[in-house]
Swiss-Prot record:
Protein name: Nitrogenase molybdenum-iron protein beta chain
Enzymatic class: oxidoreductase
Organism from which the protein derives: Crocosphaera subtropica (strain ATCC 51142 / BH68)
InterPro entries: ChlB/BchB/BchZ, Nase/OxRdtase_comp1, Nase_comp1_CS, Nase_Mo-Fe_CF_bsu, Nase_Mo-Fe_CF_bsu_N
Source species, domain of life: Bacteria
Gene: nifK
């Protein structure tokens, strides 16, 4: 018997027991699986240039996408505001996916509700589901704001959110003064960063509805973007504090996604107050830290509010320098001394380690802004990006990435692959191998197949704990990036040199 009360096996050992091995073998026979030799033959063929050409010729199929659905980003934008309950107009299964996708990365509960659309609603429309859902949500959870987004089902049948919300208010199921921003977030176009942008724009337009810029409040607005490193949220707030600024971080997710365990459950955490968000229309300017996550929001702020927006990417030393100098120029305040010290530490760390990473060939994938930040840092360290892949790419991103790479001697061998997926990346790694790969947890399958060392940076990271608590921006973030990359390469070097009397001549204690 595989399991007994005196010897409980976990899943790592359990499925290697004879009973399960026999079950798996019977399953293969039942399904008529090809022989192991045939499987190996085809697997070897998929590593070839011939297969790569066929792989890159496909048009109507995505295999292992490096992006997520729009509502996921909408949820992340919404939970950063005080007392806000995300409401997804669609099926329960979709909402469960979004919640677990965030929870598995942050290791924190993420609250969201659904209108629970089923087959009937798909045929006759989801009005009743939304009205009932809003009534129950407000009665049970007492939110200060309900942020509504949609799934594919609601979008395919063309449900009119504005009209539905009007009916709900007319029926008296939610108060007239309850803010209910809504965003259409169809997952068959765009990605999670599109959903973030749509929801952020909707929240700001709803909270400032009917207002006009009257006078400056002396504040600076900050938008982090689709930010999955809570250390970065803290870094932004630390910069605001160090400059002694009156600043408003629009969608402050720090306490929601990294809350202390004090023995009492809180459904809502601090976040950006609705009053501060409503007053953001009167700020001096808005600073965004991601270009391709907030295009509609920035356009809205510039055109509707008549407010200037500035975009910075504080990755690596140069990017952080530009951000701090830009902030100093914008506010008229000097750069605090503490950042000079932090910069010196980053430069010192980079000097200590550059010999171990200089000239290393890398592959990288992720969201456009994440990849641009990583490229900035890699080029500073003399790392040579070879494969740059962004599934949710844009023409503007590709032009910017190519210009950045062309301007550096270390970017001359790089190719930017826009709109490609992780099965494309697999072909690239087999046909043009690199020294390491930077990506999220889904890259572990690429690591297993191609034996390319993986440095986990991005979202989601499901199979390692607490990386989201670190920063990737600022001078401290540069040290973290250097730490992960350099030590990952050294771990791989140890693995390659650990055979006594064969490879261990380079199994060094000091590196």
């Amino acid at each position: 018997m595989a399991q007994n009360v005196n010897n409980i096996k976990d899943h790592v050992d359990l499925f290697h027991q004879p009973e399960y091995q026999e079950l798996f073998e019977n399953k293969k026979q039942f399904e008529g699986m090809p022989t192991a030799e045939k499987v190996q033959e085809v697997a070897e063929w998929t590593k070839s240039w011939e297969y790569r050409e066929k792989n890159f010729a496909r048009e109507a199929l995505t295999v292992n996408p490096a992006k997520a659905c729009q509502p996921l980003g909408a949820l992340l934008a919404a939970i950063g505001f005080e007392g806000t309950l995300p409401f997804v107009h669609g099926s329960q299964g979709c909402v469960a996916y979004f919640r677990t996708h965030l929870t598995r990365h942050f290791k924190e509960p993420v609250s969201a509700v659904s209108s629970s659309m089923t087959e009937n609603a798909a045929v006759f429309g989801g009005l009743k589901n939304m009205v009932d859902g809003l009534q129950n949500s407000y009665a049970l959870y007492k939110p200060k704001m309900i942020a509504v987004c949609t799934t594919c089902m609601a979008e395919v049948i063309g449900d009119d959110l504005g009209a539905f919300l009007g009916n709900a208010r007319q029926d008296g199921v939610i108060p007239d003064d309850l803010p209910v921003p809504f965003a259409h977030t169809p997952s068959f176009v765009g990605s999670h960063i599109t959903g973030y942008d749509s929801m952020m724009k909707s929240i700001l337009s709803t909270l400032t509805e009917g207002k006009k810029k009257e006078t400056t409040n002396g504040k600076i607005n900050f938008i982090a973007g689709f930010e999955t490193y809570i250390g970065n949220v803290r870094a932004i707030k630390n910069i605001i504090s160090a400059f002694d600024l009156e600043g408003t971080l629009l969608s402050d997710t720090e306490m929601y996604l990294d809350s202390p365990n004090l023995g009492e459950f809180k459904m809502y955490h601090e976040g950006t107050s609705l009053e501060d968000a409503a007053d953001s229309i009167n700020a001096e300017a808005t600073v965004t830290l991601q270009t391709y996550t907030t295009p509609k929001t920035r356009e809205y702020i510039e055109k509707k509010w008549g407010q200037k927006t500035y975009t910075y990417r504080p990755w690596g030393v140069k990017g952080t320098d530009e951000f701090l100098m830009g902030l100093s120029e914008l506010t008229g305040k000097p750069i605090p001394k503490e950042f000079e010290i932090a910069r010196g530490r980053a430069v010192d760390a980079m000097t200590d380690t550059q010999a171990w990473v200089h000239g290393k060939r890398a592959a990288v994938y992720g969201d456009p802004d994440l990849v641009m930040g990583l490229l900035q840092f890699m080029l500073e360290m003399g790392i040579e990006p070879v494969h740059v892949l962004v599934n949710n790419s844009t023409k503007e991103f590709e032009e910017e990435a190519k210009a950045l790479l062309a301007a550096s001697p270390y970017g001359q061998q790089a190719t930017v692959w826009g709109g490609k997926d992780l099965w494309h990346m697999r072909s690239l790694l087999f046909t043009e191998p690199v020294d390491f790969l930077v990506g999220n947890s889904y890259a572990k399958y690429l690591q297993r197949d191609t034996k390319t060392p993986l440095i986990r940076i991005g979202y989601p990271i499901f199979d390692r704990h607490h990386l989201h608590r670190y920063s990737t921006i600022g001078y401290e973030g540069a040290i973290n990036l250097l730490n992960w990359i350099a030590n990952g390469l050294m771990d791989e070097l140890d693995r390659k040199t650990d055979t006594p009397s064969v490879t261990d001549i380079s199994f060094d204690l000091v590196r």
